[in-house]
Regions:
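Bacterial N-terminal signal peptides that target proteins for export
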Residues: 2-14
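Bacterial N-terminal signal peptides
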Residues: 13-21
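Short intrinsically disordered, low-complexity coil segments enriched in acidic
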Residues: 1-3, 23-24
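Alpha/propeptide regions of enzymes that mature by internal proteolysis
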Residues: 29-421
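Polar helix-capping/helix-linker motif
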Residues: 22-23, 415
Length: 421
């Protein structure tokens, strides 16, 4: 049995009649959805072995030494949308690259596959080549408040910022959760961000309907947070590459898992359970396409590694993460915001160097291929873990997004049909 994820705080309010539908990782709002609320699993538990490299012990971004993840999940209210009040299905997820990252900066690089969205702070990363504060993920309209939370947390730890020290431009990445959440309410508070950062840990990472992923939809199913990692053989340096995603992208017919066209076959998948074929597999697409601003979705990909890479190489890793995204079926549609940010803990960039020069270890480009492969594999698996870890959610106006059915997946991914890479 996997270790219990830590670094996650949930704020969930439910009526007594619906209390059984509440869970720390999400809330269905309804307990009658056949078998979709059975115990959630990770992709590997379904027999998927994505690529050739082995995962780290946690198969998570926190396998990279020093990296921490924290969540705050907000689930309150039900029924019709009351703008500014609820229902609330949202949250914040933070990634802390290392302790004292302000003084021990990490090399970083970013890539924007399609720019219908926002990740703040990228101009300074491109200019400086490093990252010097935590990364936060949230919903689109909550970006300014979440940035305030990151700033407040940093000011508490480094009171000289803006007085005797430099200022900062936080990195906050967004996806639109407005189909399930009262996004106008901007319910993630400054205090929520501080809690997420204070509670961030290096242990197992909660996935699916948690933190920034609480209101996300991916490939026509409940999406959200997913993570995975790869550890290179000693001959390739023994480095670890970890990925965390917030998956809010894709259309159901596009979904591919382990080479199997799951999205196309899902509605008629045979199972040995009580799950009946979906009588109207297009109902989700019709309702989503008819809603404003949320027809094509987005994905945020955070890549961490202890390989000693510079900003240019990390930007290259961000580009390769797009290949892992494509393996799951995504085509980076016109209205999708697909942002990749990579950082390395393999070097320390000092805050104010006392000498005019300092030394960094650098992995030769000719030895980069294994790291590239690991990034592609971990990105693909992190997306699938987001899907298999998510739980069904009923949000504003009674809109319901089903979690992908584990029994149907087992049938589709059985040994006689699964395509192995």
């Amino acid at each position: 049995m996997s270790p219990t994820p830590t670094g996650s705080r949930s704020i969930i309010a439910c009526s007594l009649l619906l209390m059984t539908a509440c869970a720390s990782s999400g809330w269905s709002g309804d307990t009658s959805n056949d078998m979709t609320e059975q115990t959630r699993v990770r992709a590997r538990a379904l027999g998927l072995r994505l690529g050739q490299l082995e995962p780290g012990p946690l198969n998570a971004i926190t396998d990279v030494p020093g990296v921490k993840v924290g969540h705050v999940t907000l689930i309150r209210g039900e029924g019709p949308l009351q703008p500014g009040q609820g229902p609330v299905r949202t949250g914040v997820t933070v990634v802390v690259p290392r302790e004292d990252v302000w003084h021990k900066k990490v090399p970083a690089g970013a890539f924007v596959l399609n720019g219908t969205g926002e990740m703040t702070g990228l101009a300074w990363i491109a200019e400086s080549g490093f990252l010097e504060y935590p990364i936060a993920l949230t919903n689109t309209l909550n970006v300014p408040r979440v940035a305030n939370g990151v700033i407040s947390w940093m000011l508490r730890r480094y009171p000289g910022i803006g007085i005797t020290d430099d200022t900062l431009t936080p990195v906050v990445a967004e996806c639109d959760d407005g189909r399930l959440n009262d996004i106008q309410g901007r319910h993630v508070s400054e205090a929520d961000v501080v809690h997420a950062l204070d509670d961030a840990t290096a242990g197992p990472v909660s996935e699916g309907t948690v933190g920034a992923g609480t209101g996300m939809i991916s490939y026509g199913f409940k999406g959200g947070i997913g993570t995975a990692s790869r550890r290179l053989p000693a001959a390739d340096g023994g480095f670890t590459i970890g990925v965390l995603v917030n998956a809010n992208h894709g259309r159901r017919p596009e979904l591919v898992m382990g080479g199997v066209p799951v999205g196309q076959q899902y509605a008629t998948a045979p199972t040995h359970s009580s799950v009946a074929p979906d009588p109207n597999p297009e109902r989700f697409h019709a309702s989503r396409e008819g809603s404003s601003g949320n027809a094509e979705g987005s994905i945020i990909v955070i890549i961490a590694t202890d390989a000693p890479l510079d900003s240019r190489q990390l930007t290259r890793l961000g580009k390769r993460a797009a290949l892992g995204l494509a393996r799951t079926g995504s085509t980076a549609r016109h209205g999708s915001g697909d942002f990749m940010l990579a950082f390395s803990t393999g070097n320390i960039i000092p805050h104010y160097p006392t000498e005019p020069t300092f030394s960094l270890t650098h992995l030769a480009d000719t030895h980069l291929n294994a790291v590239i492969t690991a990034t592609v594999e971990a990105t693909e698996e992190a997306i699938l873990n987001a899907l298999t870890g998510a739980t069904t959610v009923t949000g504003r106006d009674g809109f319901r997004v089903e979690a992908i059915s584990i029994p149907r997946l087992r049938a589709l991914l059985s040994s006689d049909v699964t395509i192995r890479r």
